Amino acid sequence: MATERTPITPSRRTWLSQAVLAGLGPWLGNPVWASPIEAPTTLLATWQTPDAHHIGLVDVAAKRWRVNRSLAVPTRAHGVMVESSDSVLALARRPGDWLLRWHPRTGETQWHWIGGERRFNGHVVASPQGDTLWTTETDLETAQGRLGVRDSRSLEKTDEWATHGMDPHALMVLPQALGRIPAGSLMVANGGISALPETGRAKHDLGRMDASLVALNPQTGAVLGQWRLVDSYLSIRHFAWDAVSKRVGIALQSENPDGAQRQSAPVLAVWDGEQLLPSVGQPVLQGYGGDICARPGGGFVVSCPRANALALFTPASAWSVNLPHRDTCALVAQGDQWWASGPDGILSVAPHHDNEVALAAAPEERLQFDNHWQIWPLA
């Protein structure tokens, strides 16, 4: 049953009605093969087809993958999150106006549409207790970042805090204390890029970029710390927690107007609770980190779609090796394995042996995966 907590505009109502009439609800069963995949890993993903945008579950085995079930959404999705009840959350890509809870097992949906002078920036996290959600947002009047504090059951906003920067993007709950920042603190990636509504996603005033990593008190929103990189053109985008090295890896995207400097810019920074430092010794990766995950055994993997490569780094942020993979972006890791998206198939990498790579071939129906994945259900 769909739940609408804010007024539905005619365009929203039209889309929901057309989606039902067109059969764009949950896609259950095995649409690609009748026989089951052997011991698959299931990923929560978002993707595009020629005529629709989707979120859904994808089963991945050693040599093939398939869509398990899916749900059409009104615009391109971005961040996804798996809840303890096996339901999932997805948000529209920035500047977005919808937040969705979907129950893949039953097909039940709960929609929340943001209104007024706010837009979603594509990411959400939950409190450890599961009663609160935090969403990164932008104030359309000022372009300043806001953190929406939401009731997890209703998805309604109960409070709002400043992120102390523009263009807040990813956020994470710090798993354990680092330096003077306590466990449970909210880490926010202020991308630092101004993009007001009249310009859509077009960027402006890049010479005044002010990207930062911010730690906030999860109870009050008070600032616990703020860090910046020396290169002001590096936009801070996405996070990964390395439980081995006890560090936070951050995927970067350069906005440097000088083409050569942009192409050679670092795609990773590492925060240890005290310092925020960029990667060292990396080759040219076109200055664009699409997604990031922790590397089993310690370190990080950063997808570099513009370089058609997966860049592997040590926990100290030193570049290690590149794995070629065309137009790769979405990453996810579980246990001793990690996976990466790409139009040629889903790449899976074995533990501690980064040259042991398997490519699960794409089915006949080609999908264009979006930016992020999660493992479903939660372990």
What residue ranges belong to the model's regions?
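N-terminal export signals
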Residues: M1-S35
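Surface loop/turn motifs at the tips and blade-to-blade linkers of beta-strand repeat domains
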Residues: S70-P74, W113-G116, W161-G165, W227-S232, ...
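Blade-loop segments of beta-propeller domains
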Residues: L71-E83, S87-R101, G107-A126
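Repeated scaffold domains used in trafficking and secretory/extracellular systems
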Residues: T75-V82, R119-V125, M166-V173, L234-F239, ...
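Residue-level detector of Asp-centered blade-edge/turn motifs that repeat once per structural unit
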Residues: E83-S85, P128-Q129, P175-P182, A243-V244, ...
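Asp-box/WD-like beta-propeller blade repeats and closely related beta-sheet repeat scaffolds
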Residues: G115-V125, T136-P175
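Short, conserved, GDST-rich strand-edge loop motifs in beta-rich repeat architectures
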Residues: T136-D139, A189-M209, A251-S264
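Beta-propeller blade signature
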Residues: L147-D151, L206-P218, A265-D272
